[in-house]
Swiss-Prot record:
Record-linked InterPro entries: ATP_synth_asu-like_sf, ATP_synth_asu_C, ATP_synth_asu_C_sf, ATP_synth_F1_a_nt-bd_dom, ATP_synth_F1_asu, ATPase_a/bsu_AS, ATPase_F1/V1/A1_a/bsu_N, ATPase_F1/V1/A1_a/bsu_N_sf
Similarity comment: Belongs to the ATPase alpha/beta chains family.
Naturally occurring in which organism (per UniProt): Thermobifida fusca (strain YX)
Chief localization: membrane
Keyword flag DNA damage: no
Catalytic activity: ATP + H2O + 4 H(+)(in) = ADP + phosphate + 5 H(+)(out)
NCBIfam families in the record: atpA, PRK13343.1
PROSITE patterns per the UniProt record, alphabetical: ATPASE_ALPHA_BETA (PS00152)
Protein name: ATP synthase subunit alpha
Positions contributing to ATP binding: 173-180
Gene behind this protein: atpA
Enzyme Commission number: 7.1.2.2
Xref: Pfam families: ATP-synt_ab, ATP-synt_ab_C, ATP-synt_ab_N
Its biological purpose: Produces ATP from ADP in the presence of a proton gradient across the membrane. The alpha chain is a regulatory subunit.
Length: 547
């Protein structure tokens, strides 16, 4: 009888074939956990040893939750929805998935909750595509520098702190200073681009409301509908009555919807209103999950909370489709303190900030933008040639005006040049004012700023500046529309355009009546006196002998 010999090579090959052909049956083993604690929007679950971080869990009543704290023996879960029906002893099931939301063009014109479910009463949203909330942002090699302007329609921003497609521009200020109004104006200003039908010009907009009053969100929606802007806008609403978990994920839901369009080569604008309330919701959740508190009781990863969100805003390279996601995060300060924890975090993440001051707001300067400390780190790269040419002296003129204004407050006598700078500065500040929900087209912004910086408004009384501006622009649209067309189409401002505007403004001044009844441009020019009309006085100087 021959001996049975087993060679090691055969055993190794057999094991290798078995490993390569093995396919685990996920359905064969389903983990079931048990709720050990529930309350205040969180739950603790035991018995799910294989659960992953940020995995979606499902409770008995169908409510979903996100696995956050993976501890020995139990998991800390953020409940997404009503937690009142979750009780100790109930079962919890793993889904094997991370949180995702439906995406697609069907979301345009709709109002949804942080899970992507419609809440506007217009029926279900028909879409087949989904996108995960926690996806990696575009890498360095997938991006390109910001170079295309995104017009806000607000003169102070487009001229002094320009925003480009793919930029993150922080809107920061105290409560009730017009932060939301600035962002809504920017959304409304995209209407002309949307109606053009040009995919390279069209901008889809997303407004994420975190912790706002329900009436405030309804007011924003009404304003957008009245302006015809809801056609290209999606609202993700997580009002103050929502659980902390919803407020925490709402900005990620909005960015997931926007990223879907960005990676299709489209342009997107997203407004986060506001990230202060998201940070507070995340702090509440973290403290309930017993995470160690840090500065101002925020958890240690609150910087990562915002950085991973805002890094998703990008201008993609041509190879990736050249789409863009522009972010306008809003941060609320207390007593204009920008050195607090969350404001400094977001300032360091973003590409610039627009600072709104309550003092300026109360003085009637609206939008209440402090142009001195507002900055755009993208700068002129996100401006048209026309705007670059006319704003050169605007920032310097405003800076000199602020310095002289502080000096003149002491009652000191000023020379003629300083008085002229003060007069022009007051007119420039008046020129930067504009009404809410009334954004300016780019060509009209250029004309207004050109008129102010070149001295054509120096003879217009300060109280008549805004009326002069609106009537002059209406006159141009009516009588000299070609000038505006040239600026809009070429995005440049040449000498011929400047000459044509100079002639037009001189003609218009002859018809403009100031509030005191004076017609501008009707004063006869001063003529030189004849030599015989000039009296000559002889001054005798007495000589004194020196000692």
């Amino acid at each position: 009888m021959a001996e049975l010999t087993i060679r090691p090579e055969e055993i190794r090959d057999a094991l290798q074939r078995f490993v390569q052909s093995y396919e685990p049956d996920a359905a064969a083993r389903e983990e079931i956990g048990t709720v050990t604690y529930s309350g205040d929007g969180i739950a603790r679950v035991s018995g799910l040893p294989s659960a992953m971080a940020n995995e979606l869990l499902e409770f008995e009543d169908g409510t979903q939750g996100i696995a956050q704290n993976l501890e020995i023996g139990e998991i800390g879960v953020v409940v997404l929805g009503d937690f009142t029906n979750i009780a100790e002893g109930q079962t919890v099931r793993r889904t094997g998935q991370v949180l995702s939301v439906p995406v697609g063009d069907a979301y345009l014109g709709r109002v949804v909750d942080p899970l992507g479910r419609p809440i506007d009463g217009k029926g279900e949203i028909e879409t087949t595509e989904r996108r995960e909330l926690e996806l990696q942002a575009a890498t360095v090699m997938q991006r390109k520098p910001v170079h295309e302007p995104l017009q806000t329609g607000i003169k102070a921003i487009d001229a002094l702190t320009p925003i480009g497609r793919g930029q993150r521009q922080l809107i920061i200020g105290d409560r009730q200073t017009g932060k939301t109004a600035v962002c809504i104006d920017t959304i409304i200003n995209q209407k002309a681009n949307w109606e053009s039908g040009d995919p390279n010009k069209q901008v889809r907009c997303i407004y994420v409301a975190v912790g706002q009053k329900g009436s405030t969100i309804a007011g924003v929606r009404a304003a957008l509908e009245e302006a015809g802007a809801m056609e290209y806008t999606t609202i993700v609403a997580s009002p103050a009555s929502d659980p902390a978990g919803f407020k925490y994920i709402a900005p990620y839901t909005g960015s997931a919807i926007g990223q879907h369009w960005m990676y299709q080569g489209k342009h997107v604008l997203i407004v986060f209103d506001d990230l202060t309330k998201q940070a507070e919701a995340y702090r509440a959740v973290s403290l309930l999950l017993r995470r160690p508190p840090g500065r101002e009781a925020y958890p240690g990863d609150v910087f990562y909370l915002h950085s991973r969100l805002l890094e998703r805003c990008a201008k993609l390279s041509d190879e990736m489709g050249a789409g863009s996601l522009t972010g306008l995060p809003i941060i609320e300060t207390k007593a204009n303190d920008v050195s607090a924890y969350i404001p400094t975090n977001v300032i360091s993440i973003t590409d610039g900030q627009v600072f709104l001051e309550s003092d300026l707001f109360n003085q009637g300067q609206r939008p209440a933008i402090n142009v001195g400390i507002s900055v755009s780190r993208v700068g002129g790269a996100a401006q048209t040639k026309a705007m670059k040419k006319v704003v050169g002296s605007l920032r310097v003129g405003l800076a000199q005006y602020r310095d002289l204004e502080a000096f003149a407050a002491f009652g000191s006598d000023l020379d003629a040049a300083s008085k002229a700078q003060l007069e022009r500065g007051a007119r420039l500040m008046e020129l930067l004012k504009q009404g809410q929900y009334s954004p300016f087209p780019m060509e009209e912004e250029v004309v207004s700023i050109w008129a102010g910086t070149t001295g054509h408004l120096d003879d217009v009384p300060v109280e008549d500046i805004r009326r002069f501006e609106s009537e002059f622009l209406a006159y141009l649209r009516r009588e000299h529309s070609k000038i505006l067309d040239v600026i809009r189409e070429t995005e440049d401002f040449g000498d011929d355009t400047a000459e044509a505007l100079t002639d037009a403004i001189k003609e218009f001044k002859k018809t403009f009546q100031t509030s005191d009844g004076t017609i501008l441009g009707t004063e006869a020019p001063a003529e030189a006196l004849d030599e015989s009309e000039v009296g000559q006085e002889t001054i005798k100087v007495a000589k004194t002998s020196g000692k």
